[in-house]
């Protein structure tokens, strides 16, 4: 079946929904979501959203400098300036949509400070800021008459000239996006969504790794689709591992112990109770995430331990419960009282700094296709993301994409000659074990060889293993009736390959990419 919309939005986190709300007054919007609107990475963001609001002590230049330092000086300066300077107006847009940020008794924002920030500038809603934003946007989206929500729909491929029989290569200068083939997971039908403009907002790819704080839907779908359509993908080697995910084997996703807990005064300790951050960085537990994650990884490998501890037992118990109610309840459910007991933590794949390369308008290298949020690479994060810069990047670039696409979408027409999905000659896959086992294998390969610390030999081994899985999976895809599980396996193999290949191409240790065989560049 063919469905036509002015705007096709693939993904329903803060990026996809804020874009949808900004364009919906001017045209019909399809919001495609592979599970439900609640199941986005945004929902899991605890810490907050960074913006200069207290101008008595803070200013844009400080936020810009902090971002450049965190990014190891390879962030795109224009992107950094754009996000920092436009942040306050986008915070207001969120408030207008119903987001309730915590305030102090004077009615001013109650600001947190997190690792890498020189000032208190993190707006938050207790310790579940992402959930507050997601729920507010869901309400606004559901109310809008021009937005049609397609939940349990999974985008398989974006449509380009390739689907009209034209040969498209990475050198083709004018690739255009005409929409997407989308699988209705409940009926197993593939629909052709034709659009004037498409926005990719599919989030990150934490599910490529064995341990991740991301929801299980974070399989890098948008990045894989755009790469297969010959779009440009950049900086995939920069994977941020959150240093402190709650250590609870079998939890997937891993429960996040927010950065704000270290900003609050939490101390990292080894299993025998000794502090260790003084060996690694003068900022101790408040050092940037990559330094803390490598320090914890090193302590664990050196000692043969499977976790370290985060200690807030020296803080006022009532204050701890007030600041971190969710963390307190979660730990208590596991028999850990954080006001008296140390919290067991270990690093987990958390955030992708790279993705679909976009310009200042959030436009990708494929015409009529924009990308916003974690699936995009704006250049803001460079080699490493500054804490709480991602939610604000998503709304700033969603705004840019909305303005640019609204200025141009009426110039475009639907490509009615795109053929419908053809699955002749395919059969139902009777062997789901092939897919589930291969997915586990990808996660094991990535965690072992392309994790926090890398070497040339590990990366080469990952290449060889992924190459074999790629060949087998492509063969299975051609023969089988399409399914969400098979598409996700294909996507994590594509994304794993991109992370590994771009890691091999970077002949230095920089930001989050740490290769023992290539010492840190002094440049």
List the predicted regions and their residue ranges:
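An anion/pyrophosphate-binding glycine-rich loop and adjacent beta-alpha core
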Residues: 37, 225, 231-338, 343, ...
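Short beta-strand to alpha-helix junction loop
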Residues: 75-88, 121-139, 150, 212-220, ...
